[in-house]
């Protein structure tokens, strides 16, 4: 059975998600939408927005992978250090 996440943590995660979503939306909108003379979204604006989102997702994934690699290295270093400290001389 999966552990339940406390409600306060769920709220915090949701607020962080909304903050990230809002920032991404604003960034891509400001970069991609330039013409307000029509109610329709132009194809180049759609393409730009899609590329902006894809770039952000790839960046987020890459940072996550690098963070995991760094965390693993730190854990291995701590384990090695603990192993050395635990051995008699």
UniProtKB/Swiss-Prot annotation:
Disulfide bond annotation, renumbered to this chain: 28-52, 32-48
Main location per the UniProt record: mitochondrion
PANTHER family from the UniProt entry: MITOCHONDRIAL IMPORT INNER MEMBRANE TRANSLOCASE SUBUNIT TIM9B
Organism: Mus musculus
Domain of life per record: Eukaryota
Record's keyword terms, sorted: Acetylation, Chaperone, Disulfide bond, Membrane, Metal-binding, Mitochondrion, Mitochondrion inner membrane, Protein transport, Translocation, Transport, Zinc
Subcellular localization(s) per the UniProt record: Mitochondrion inner membrane
Protein known as: Mitochondrial import inner membrane translocase subunit Tim9
Membrane topology: Peripheral membrane protein
N-acetylalanine modified-residue sites: 2
């Amino acid at each position: 059975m999966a552990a339940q996440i406390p409600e306060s943590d769920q709220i915090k995660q949701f607020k962080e998600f909304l903050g990230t979503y809002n920032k991404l939306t604003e960034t891509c909108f400001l970069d991609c939408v330039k013409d307000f003379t029509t109610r329709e979204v132009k194809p180049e604006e759609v393409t730009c927005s899609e590329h902006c989102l894809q770039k952000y997702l790839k960046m987020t994934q890459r940072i996550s992978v690098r963070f995991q690699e760094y965390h693993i290295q730190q854990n291995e270093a701590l384990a090695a250090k603990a192993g050395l400290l635990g051995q008699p001389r």
